[in-house]
Regions:
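Contiguous, glycine/small-aliphatic-enriched amphipathic segments in soluble metabolic enzymes
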Residues: 1-137, 182-264, 268-283, 288-291, ...
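Short, well-ordered, mixed-charge alpha-helical segments that flank or form enzyme active sites
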Residues: 125-129, 149-151, 160-163, 170-172, ...
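Short, flexible loop segments at boundaries between secondary-structure elements
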Residues: 144-159, 288-302
């Protein structure tokens, strides 16, 4: 349910109060029972669930459509009267997701195994206060699943965007951008689009600099880093194109000319996604052996506990997770795209290694 002091509990109960959502899957909520009860009361939604202590053994009955709440209330008292970043909120929200990852990684015949994980919003500041080195969910999932190649991606009705870099100061982007960091989201995003039924995805790659560098006048990253990554992808049959100026490529993508845009940094990709797909966009971590999605918003401490949060993005995240999990059930092979340095793909090992810490 994400940070217990944010809007995560509210959007969870609102989403699961929808009978159409509840019929899609059997749900296990990792959270605090008292927090969920309070959220349901404030939002005035009716939702029944089973509760078990998080520390107890449990097995989910596949025929039961009521959610199962793994209750962490025994972990300690939580002051919900003042929403905001806290050490305890960080400890709890990390415990929720750590246990969910453990259950998603269980053997296929284990009754506790999850087919997908949909994460509620966490506070990166709370995680930092609690002493965790991970800046967010994406990095933790990659570490726990031993996924060397992964990318943060956003899917909305009008745009799909994958990021070459994510949670970095803007001044650092040009220093960490490598051929591998640009190649990975092209390759992984291509596979994701194919999972959605797009046989031959058309991919546009953004430049880093104004006017995509204007032939080196405003920077050399386009020719030195981005174009070689595009060429490597094209050599294995990926329809990758660019680099294009970031201020115009999203217009064409929103009009349907591109199935995926690869952005070089966080705000370059997320501003158009949220502008055009607010309340419907979903964050997906591509490249993992498990399915992980999340709503595209944060904890919104400023409106937490007021019953005002929209559950639209959480519903969309659940719907996409169910779709991806169903697809994987018919094809148990997890993503194993070719990285730079493997047969059929040109590149240097240094660039590939540098991409291991991508978001």
């Amino acid at each position: 349910m994400g940070d217990p002091l944010g809007i995560g509990p509210e959007v969870v109960v609102k989403a699961l109060a929808d009978p159409a959502i509840r019929r899609m899957a059997n749900f296990v909520i990792y959270g605090r029972n008292e927090t969920l009860l309070a959220a349901a009361d404030r939002a005035r939604v009716g939702l029944d669930w089973f509760r078990v202590d998080a520390a107890s053994e449990r097995a989910q009955d596949g025929s039961v459509l009521q959610p199962l709440v793994l209750d962490y209330t025994s972990e300690g008292l939580l002051d919900a009267s003042r929403p905001g970043p806290t050490r305890f909120g960080g400890l709890l929200s990390k415990a929720f997701v750590e246990d969910a990852i453990t259950d998603a990684m269980r053997a296929p015949n284990d009754p506790r195994r999850l087919d997908a994980v949909v994460t509620g919003p966490i506070s990166k500041e709370s995680w930092s206060i609690a002493g965790f080195k991970w800046p967010g969910h994406t990095e933790l999932f990659a570490f726990r699943t031993k996924s060397k190649r992964h990318s943060m991606m956003f899917s909305s009705p009008r745009l799909r965007v994958a990021l070459a870099t994510a949670h970095l100061p803007l001044m650092d982007v040009r220093n960490v951008l490598t051929i591998g960091k640009v190649y990975d989201p092209i390759d992984l995003g291509h596979q994701f689009c194919q999972q959605l039924g797009i046989a031959k995805p058309r991919i546009a790659v953004c430049g880093l600099n104004p006017h995509a560098g204007e032939h080196g006048m405003f920077g050399d990253e386009e020719g030195r880093v981005i174009r070689p990554a595009i060429e490597a992808a094209r050599r294995i049959g990926i329809d990758a194109n660019g680099p294009f100026p970031g201020d115009t490529v999203f217009i064409a993508a929103a009009a349907g000319e591109w199935d995926l845009v690869v952005a070089m940094y966080h705000d370059q990709g997320l501003i158009p996604v949220k502008l055009l797909g607010w309340d419907k966009a979903v964050n997906v971590t591509v490249g993992l052996p498990i399915v992980r999605t999340s709503p595209d918003h944060g904890t919104a401490f400023d409106i937490a506990g007021q019953g005002r949060a929209s559950e639209g993005s959480m519903k969309a995240a659940i719907e996409l997770a169910v779709r991806l999990a169903a697809q994987r059930r018919t094809d148990w092979s997890s993503p194993h795209p070719r990285g730079l340095g493997q047969p059929g793909v040109a590149g240097d090992a240094g660039a590939m290694a540098a991409s291991d810490d991508d978001d």
